[in-house]
Amino acid sequence: MVLDEVKDLNLKKLVVLAEDDFETREAVKNSDCEILFQTGKGYGNAIREGIKHATTKYIAIFYADGSTDPIDLKPMINKIIDDKNQIVFGSRYEKNAGSYDDNWITRIGNYFFTKFGNVFFSLNISDILFTYIVAEKNTMDKLKLNSDDYCLCVEIALKTKELGFKYTTHPCFERERLADKKKVKAFSDGFKILNYMIKKLISKLIYNK
């Protein structure tokens, strides 16, 4: 289980899940963690509610399916403490990085959205859709995130740039899932993300915000 991998780390664990997810509730009931039930639905909603209820100075978005590797947590937090970054984005597309879960559709899609963000929003990022993120809690609060779906991936990056927060990236390897299955729908969710980014671009060009 994912929680077993981080049980010896000095961190507070907050598990966000739907109230009717009885399988996960049973799996974590004896673990050293706090359980938070979503008041809404969706991938982005779970992350937003986790951020809202976190009480530590630094936070990490860590996947319950086992695809994020805890070996990256320490170097990512060091890039905040030592290098004075406010947000560190994990990346599957840098040297010494990769993904077990990627396919040609998701790779092309990620390349497109990352390029879109870098060109039109002056981002300097290599993987805009990966939300393995370590950040200052108060910085994440200031982003005032509102996406309940996968648009949250790009919302975090775009608002980080818009608000002038200092950020960097860290190469990560997305592991094979230990549990659950891929929920993202490449075309329908991709269209939502594209629509979100176009709206943000129009707002930027017309209203400069």
Regions flagged by a language model, labelled:
Residues L9, N30-D32:
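Short, structured coil segments at secondary-structure junctions
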